[in-house]
Amino acid sequence: MANFLFEFEKPLVELENKISDLKKFAEEKNIDVSRELELLSAKAQQLAKEIYQNLTPWQRVLLARHPERPNTRDYINYLCDDFIELKGDRRFGDDPAMIGGIGIIENIPVTIVGNLKGKDTKENIMRNFGMAHPEGYRKAIRLFKQAEKFGRPVLTFIDTPGAFCGIGAEERGQFQAIAEAIATLISLKTPVLAVITGEGGSGGALALAAGDKLLMLENAVFSVIAPESFAAILWKDSSRAQEASELLKLTSEHLLEFGLIDGIIPEPLGGAHRNPAETLKAVKEEVVKNLQILKETPVEELLRRRYQRYRYIGSGIVEGGVS
């Protein structure tokens, strides 16, 4: 059960705690409360459906940022029978906000690259909250090209508020590194599968997303800017982030409707943080299925489709929906 709660989750968690306390009391006193537990459990299940099947875009943003969602390291550990991490961009240094290496998934050698957030405050500071520097993106580019050289498919995991925008990052060519990462992926002569697992923030996310297929977890988000920043720029009021999230159309359902992603990976009721094991299993099933499909497709066909995809991406979107 999650230790970190959002306001809209509290009624459910309070009820679940009540059920847990009642079970403990019944065991200690050796009394039968099975009927009461059955009624409370049914009530909790119904309340969970009411909460999580009617989430607003802002609530999905909050879930995408939940500190107890599985991170890229969790996915690597679950998916891979073996994984060798590779570090450094061979130009400046390594970036802990970006993890990359070679893994074996169901006997398929795969190059894996992803944003990496921390599990606690100390690790988040070390990993810069998943916001990569130029050396992180250049490390990714190095691994993309290595994958192409050895004929390995590329799998990326995206979970970042965006690329780091500090002075040092800009001085070291952040914009150029992101642009080169996008260009490299689009022209890469090997299959590329991308999965947005949490936050997909701006160019920092797009640098890992320009592949043959782009999947999103149900409660992940993908947008050109964070709702708070959108509100601060447009209305000079970051407190209107909830309103901004409605306008950004950043949920997986919106993006699938617009044709900007290829599929949605369902999350357990309540979100990935409430049942990480089920989430990891669902992601592995989709990753293995899509990797096998992409591996069976000739590289020339992948490149042709990829060019068409990004040459005309968004061209069917008009005001009010999809044309």
Curated annotation (Swiss-Prot):
Q: Which Pfam families match?
A: ACCA
Q: Which domain of life is it from?
A: Bacteria
Q: Which GO terms describe its cellular component?
A: acetyl-CoA carboxylase complex
What InterPro entries does this protein map onto? Acetyl_CoA_COase_a_su (IPR001095), ClpP/crotonase-like_dom_sf (IPR029045), COA_CT_C (IPR011763)
Question: Which pathway?
Answer: Lipid metabolism; malonyl-CoA biosynthesis; malonyl-CoA from acetyl-CoA: step 1/1
What are the BP-aspect GO terms?
fatty acid biosynthetic process; malonyl-CoA biosynthetic process
Q: Recorded E.C. number(s)?
A: 2.1.3.15
**What positions does the domain CoA carboxyltransferase C-terminal occupy?**
36-293
Q: Where in the cell is it found?
A: Cytoplasm
Q: Which reaction does it catalyse?
A: N(6)-carboxybiotinyl-L-lysyl-[protein] + acetyl-CoA = N(6)-biotinyl-L-lysyl-[protein] + malonyl-CoA
Instruction: Please tell me which top-level EC class this enzyme sits in.
Output: transferase
Output one GO MF annotation.
acetyl-CoA carboxylase activity
Q: Which UniProt keywords apply?
A: ATP-binding, Cytoplasm, Fatty acid biosynthesis, Fatty acid metabolism, Lipid biosynthesis, Lipid metabolism, Nucleotide-binding, Transferase
Q: What does this protein do?
A: Component of the acetyl coenzyme A carboxylase (ACC) complex. First, biotin carboxylase catalyzes the carboxylation of biotin on its carrier protein (BCCP) and then the CO(2) group is transferred by the carboxyltransferase to acetyl-CoA to form malonyl-CoA.
Subunit relationships: Acetyl-CoA carboxylase is a heterohexamer composed of biotin carboxyl carrier protein (AccB), biotin carboxylase (AccC) and two subunits each of ACCase subunit alpha (AccA) and ACCase subunit beta (AccD).
- What family is this? Belongs to the AccA family.
Question: By what name is this protein known?
Answer: Acetyl-coenzyme A carboxylase carboxyl transferase subunit alpha
Species of the source: Carboxydothermus hydrogenoformans (strain ATCC BAA-161 / DSM 6008 / Z-2901)
